[in-house]
A protein has these predicted regions:
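Bacterial N-terminal signal peptides
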Residues: 5-16
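Intrinsically disordered, low-structural-confidence terminal and linker regions
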Residues: 19-51
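Extended ligand-binding clefts on enzyme/binding-domain cores
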Residues: 38-84, 113-117, 157-158, 172-178, ...
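Aromatic-rich carbohydrate-recognition surfaces in CAZymes
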Residues: 113-120, 170-194
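Short glycine/serine- and small hydrophobic-enriched flexible loop segments
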Residues: 124-132, 182-195, 249-253, 352-359, ...
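Solenoid-like repeat scaffolds
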Residues: 432-440
């Protein structure tokens, strides 16, 4: 089998004559790397003999009673995903910093950062899910993996430092939990796709990473997902979380892979926090804030039963104990912006994460969360996707000066709409609205969320 390093070199040499795309823009002007290599692994002949076990398109069976866009054919949806994937990969996958490495370019920053672990996680999931359509998916995935391994956190070689600069150095050894969780999930996807045909032990690496996440990025007292590896019991932020770091389908996958019932309780307790916030602070809209503080939650005795056949134990909880829970939205400027306690650029991902869990597991906790959210967003927009604002307070009112399109807000509402047939016309409108934008219309964050959400909306997302 050809080495990854040689494959990337050959691909870079061939790029200029084998792939063009009408949606290209001026090349990135990074410090040391020939960025013409960014399209090196796109659209070229296969360099590996092995085929993925679950090639795109998968048309995965989702939970009974959920919906997909029904005004266009499956073939048209799949083609839309393929087309946008080509544009996304060409623009965002960059070869560097080492000869066998690639990263997801953190476009749009005015600073010196070229990559964040959040984007690396997005990219590794996307590439693994698009294997089969992309003949070079495994080579690309492995290059992304090597970049992640070359930039570890200071506390663990299995977690990724949260950001890297143009000189290919990590700013510090801290982590971002969402990036680590997506990378770990992608390793399980990679194992399902190519596990028997790789020099990288994807499953073993996933298990090491899952264990590191468990011990460094989840609060052992409350089972709540923390913001990073930087919080200890002495930290003021020890009982805080970023709402978008709760990815219940990932936690279920970690449970299946590791056999650790810790993840069962983590799913239950994080859902309980979300339910409390909806009921207490957003009873009309069903929103949660970017950051949640002072979380205190008991851990009642629970029993579990499988969500679907073959998913294994521990997917859906039954709880009989009296709940004791408290939490508050973060104050302004808690960490990032005046809107840290609002539904802003972090929490906008929550509908996607919860809906993805419902599509795969059918958990009634996810259904209950979405049952509040979906009627509100349809009503407040009058059924017009163009009226979705780029941010809301928890009462469901638009944040000031946010009347512009932001796919990071729009796409997750589309995934949320899949939860019920009541949303069918709304979902159809959202699909059409999303796909009419080109890659050049938005930056890394919006486009990467759009890419993952299109995979889900077309019925091509699955659990490893």
């Amino acid at each position: 089998m050809i080495s990854l390093k040689l494959a990337l070199v050959c691909l870079a040499q061939l790029m200029q004559t084998t792939f063009t795309h009408s949606d290209s823009t001026a090349p990135y002007t990074g410090p040391t790397h020939d960025t013409s290599e960014l399209t090196a692994a796109v659209g070229l002949p296969r360099l590996r003999d092995d085929q993925p076990a679950r090639p795109f398109p998968q048309h995965s069976p989702y939970r009974a009673g959920t919906i997909l866009p029904d005004h266009i054919s499956q073939e048209v949806m799949d083609d839309s995903v393929r087309s946008f994937y080509q544009a996304w990969k060409e623009h965002y996958i960059r070869v560097g910093c080492g000869p066998d490495e690639a990263y997801v370019w953190f476009e749009g920053t005015k600073g010196t950062n070229i990559c964040v672990s959040e984007g690396q996680g997005y990219g590794m999931m996307i590439v693994a899910l698009m294997a089969g359509y992309d003949p070079n998916a495994q080579a690309t995935y492995d290059a992304l993996y090597h970049f992640y391994k070359s930039h570890p956190a200071t506390t663990s070689p299995h977690l990724m430092a949260w950001t890297q600069t143009k000189d290919c150095q990590s700013i510090d050894g801290g982590t971002a939990t969402d990036g680590d969780m997506d990378i770990a999930y992608s390793l399980l996807l990679a194992d399902a796709q190519w596990g028997k045909h790789s020099s990288i032990p994807y499953r073993e690496e996933a298990l090491e990473m899952i264990n590191a996440i468990r011990h460094q990025e989840v609060n052992p007292d409350t089972y709540i997902v923390m913001e990073s590896n930087g919080w200890t019991k002495r930290s003021l932020d020890y009982f805080d979380m970023r709402s978008s770091d709760f990815m219940p389908d990932h936690l279920r996958a970690f449970r299946r892979a590791s056999g650790d019932t810790f993840w069962d309780t983590a799913v239950v307790n994080n859902y309980r926090v979300f339910r409390y916030l909806q009921d207490t602070y957003s009873p009309e809209a069903g929103l949660v804030p970017d950051f949640i503080r002072q979380i205190h939650v008991t851990t009642p005795q629970q029993s579990y039963f499988p969500a679907t056949a073959g998913d294994g134990p521990g997917d859906i909880p039954e709880t009989t104990a009296v709940e004791k829970i408290s939490a508050v939205p973060a104050q302004p400027h808690y960490l990032e912006s005046p809107y840290d306690g609002k539904y802003n650029f972090n929490a906008c991902r929550v509908p996607w994460r919860i809906a993805a869990d419902y599509l795969l597991s059918g958990d009634p906790q996810a259904a209950a969360f979405l049952a509040k959210l979906n009627p509100w967003i349809r009503s407040t927009t009058k059924g017009n996707p163009d009226n979705i604002s780029a941010g809301y307070n928890l009462a469901g009112e638009d944040l000031p000066h946010r009347y512009f399109e932001a796919l990071c807000f729009i796409c997750p509402f589309a995934v949320a709409a899949t939860a019920s047939p009541d949303n069918q016309q709304w979902l159809n409108k959202l699909w059409d609205y999303i796909v009419h934008f080109q890659r050049k219309d938005f930056d890394y964050y919006d486009n990467s969320i759009k890419m993952i959400n299109m995979i889900i909306l077309s019925g091509n997302y699955w659990a490893p």
